[in-house]
């Protein structure tokens, strides 16, 4: 629900878990702050939102390695470095909303790169994120700003 409006979403292939772990395929249970928007400026103009917004660049990735000091943070990836690339050809990360799951404090192995992002056309399960159609995500973005929260629950 967004206010009084129901918006269909796709969740992680393992459902919703309170004890999220890295790579478990689950969407974390809890209440999280909406932090910022990342978007592909080469594909669309900056979406209407009150959130802080940042352009996704080719080298931008999200650290998923629990042993790395950059864990669950964005970083500029070199050609051979692992990480969840935000610059994707499939359009799933054309709009990415970062939430506060495992951010303060960051705990190694408790899950990283949990976003709201664009759903696959067939609406298949995610690796743990919350996915929406691009039009629904754009409509939602127009209503989001600093201080907005998301409740993820069964």
Q: What are these language model-derived features?
A:
Residues 132:
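A conserved hydrophobic position in a structured secondary element of the catalytic/binding core
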Residues 1-126, 138-154:
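Cell wall/extracellular polymer interaction/catalysis modules
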Residues 129:
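Short cysteine clusters
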């Amino acid at each position: 629900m967004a206010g009084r409006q129901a918006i269909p979403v796709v969740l992680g292939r393992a459902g919703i878990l309170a004890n999220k772990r890295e790579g478990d395929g689950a969407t974390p249970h809890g209440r999280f702050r909406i932090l910022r928007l990342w978007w592909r400026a080469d594909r669309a103009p900056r979406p209407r939102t009150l959130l802080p917004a940042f352009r996704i660049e080719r080298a931008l990735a999200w650290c998923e390695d629990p042993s790395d000091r950059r864990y669950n943070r964005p970083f500029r990836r070199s050609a051979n470095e692992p990480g969840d690339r935000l610059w994707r050809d499939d359009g799933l990360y054309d709009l990415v909303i970062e939430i506060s799951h495992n951010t303060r404090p960051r705990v190694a192995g408790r899950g990283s790169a949990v976003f709201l992002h664009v759903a696959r056309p067939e609406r298949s399960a995610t690796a743990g994120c919350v996915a929406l159609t691009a039009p629904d995500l754009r409509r939602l973005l127009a209503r989001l700003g600093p201080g907005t929260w998301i409740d993820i629950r069964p």
